[in-house]
């Protein structure tokens, strides 16, 4: 599975086409990685959008990627919000509702099975389930968690976990239903269907191989969820 950046900035459309072509050739399912239109901040800065504006922006980003995917014989299977938008809709009713409405509208081009990838226990998960949207619960291999299940802010030391053994052990624990250690030292159980590893985490490619092998060795079946 491959989440493809969907923000209409720079040479993103060329990259979208190239990524969709590569994914189609390898049988990899495609997800739209929608985000705030924030190139300088890489989509990681909090932004305030009016409800209808965010809904329209999200529909546009999904639609643009969907056109690229269909042009090469595949489709967008799921949507994973990025960065600050992902964190905001975990707790913000208005912005979460705008994203849910956008996915319902995007079904006209992507199909009724279009899924949302979301944090377990979040506002966006609840609203998506209420709207009968398929939900893929997501856990993070390389990010620290607060005790309430939200992600630790990237401005704090230790918010990104890069030590390979620690990452692999966390992922195995989450996949097995065992608790991990939250940022404040308390135990936290994260129920998830999918594991996220950020591409800009140091050593991400090799780390992904280690995670997969660790899961296989632990008896966990690794497969695309959608």
Model-found features: residue ranges?
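Conserved, mostly hydrophobic/aromatic
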Residues: 33, 79, 197
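Glycine-rich tight-turn/loop motif centered on a GG-T
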Residues: 6-7, 40-55, 89-92, 110, ...
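Single conserved hydrophobic/aromatic residue that forms the stacking wall/gate
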Residues: 1-13
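Active-site rim beta-loop-alpha module in soluble metabolic enzymes
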Residues: 121-179
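Glycine/small-residue-rich loop that forms an oxyanion/phosphate-binding "nest" at active or ligand-binding sites
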Residues: 39-72, 78
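C-terminal domain-boundary segment and adjacent tail
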Residues: 206-226
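Acidic (Asp/Glu)-rich catalytic clusters
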Residues: 18-31, 70-72
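Charged helix-capping and loop-helix junction motifs
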Residues: 92-100
């Amino acid at each position: 599975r491959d989440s493809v950046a969907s923000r209409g900035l720079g040479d993103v459309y060329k990259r979208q086409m190239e990524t969709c072509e590569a994914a189609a050739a390898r049988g990899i399912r495609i997800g739209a990685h929608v985000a705030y239109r924030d190139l300088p901040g890489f989509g990681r800065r909090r932004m305030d959008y009016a409800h209808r504006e965010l809904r329209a922006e999200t529909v546009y980003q999904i639609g643009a990627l969907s056109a690229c995917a269909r042009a090469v014989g595949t489709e967008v299977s799921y949507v994973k919000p990025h960065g600050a938008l992902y964190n905001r809709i975990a707790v913000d009713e208005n912005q979460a509702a705008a994203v849910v409405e956008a996915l319902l509208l995007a079904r006209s081009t992507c199909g009724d099975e279009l899924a949302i990838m979301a944090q377990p226990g979040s506002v966006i998960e609840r609203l998506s389930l209420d709207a009968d949207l398929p939900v893929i619960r997501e856990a993070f291999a390389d990010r620290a968690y607060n005790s309430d299940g939200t992600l630790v802010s990237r401005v704090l030391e230790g918010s990104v976990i890069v030590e390979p053994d620690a990452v692999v052990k966390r992922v195995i624990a989450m996949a097995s239903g065992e608790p991990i250690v939250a940022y404040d030292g308390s135990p936290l159980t994260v129920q998830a269907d999918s594991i996220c590893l950020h591409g800009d985490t140091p050593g991400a490619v090799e780390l992904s191989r280690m995670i997969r092998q660790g899961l296989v060795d632990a008896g966990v079946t690794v497969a695309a969820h959608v």
